[in-house]
Amino acid sequence: MRVILLGAPGAGKGTQATFIKEAFDIPQISTGDMLRAAVKAGTQLGLEAKRYMDSGGLVPDDVIIGLVKERIKDADCQQGFLFDGFPRTIPQAEAMKQAGVDIDYVVEIDVPDEEIIKRMSGRRTHLPSGRTYHVVFNPPKVAGKDDVTGEDLVQRDDDKEETVAKRLEVYHRQTKPLVDYYSNWAANGAANAPKYVRISGLGEVSEIRRQVLQALGK
């Protein structure tokens, strides 16, 4: 089972990724983890990537694709894999297609922007422990205070409404075209096209999980 999981920040991808990994016993592969591992191992591609990273530049797509091809040859990928946060752009998706990296399913977790802003801007965090709350969905016993210590909760910069709105803008500009790319490819019925599935990310986590796993044949 080879899966790409798409969706905006705050759509609940991380939660569903865990369910998919467990159901199919496949590794979750992120480009960040892959880059760090290759740099640490000192592979040729890892050293090449490190040069770009050290200079503050973006690692080029051909290096990323090379790392992907290396990673999916590992023993833990024999039953498949789940790509998390990759590909991010159409050139990366095209490069992956040209490199012969076949995908079975592309799953999009679809949540409206206003719901994502509500979810993320309502988060409150107790910084010393990392405990998180939500003003609507999981409020603390006393507003603005940690349940355990009684200390103040804060809204992290990442969770502020204007920051969330900016991240969504980047997502729509950069990643949303991938949704069209994969859905059009699937609709054309090409022999090696992945199946494209859009699942609503609204509602109970368990129901979304059921729909995702059912779409993947579980």
Swiss-Prot record:
TM stretches of this protein: none
Pathway(s) the chain acts in: Purine metabolism; AMP biosynthesis via salvage pathway; AMP from ADP: step 1/1
Entry EC number(s): 2.7.4.3
Keyword Nucleotide-binding set for record: yes
Gene Ontology molecular function: any one: adenylate kinase activity
Binding site for ATP: 10-15, 123, 132-133, 203
Reactions accelerated catalytically: AMP + ATP = 2 ADP
Quaternary structure and interacting proteins, as annotated: Monomer.
UniProt family annotation: Belongs to the adenylate kinase family.
Task performed by this protein: Catalyzes the reversible transfer of the terminal phosphate group between ATP and AMP. Plays an important role in cellular energy homeostasis and in adenine nucleotide metabolism.
Domain comment, as recorded: Consists of three domains, a large central CORE domain and two small peripheral domains, NMPbind and LID, which undergo movements during catalysis. The LID domain closes over the site of phosphoryl transfer upon ATP binding. Assembling and dissambling the active center during each catalytic cycle provides an effective means to prevent ATP hydrolysis.
Descriptive protein name: Adenylate kinase
Organism: Methylobacillus flagellatus (strain ATCC 51484 / DSM 6875 / VKM B-1610 / KT)
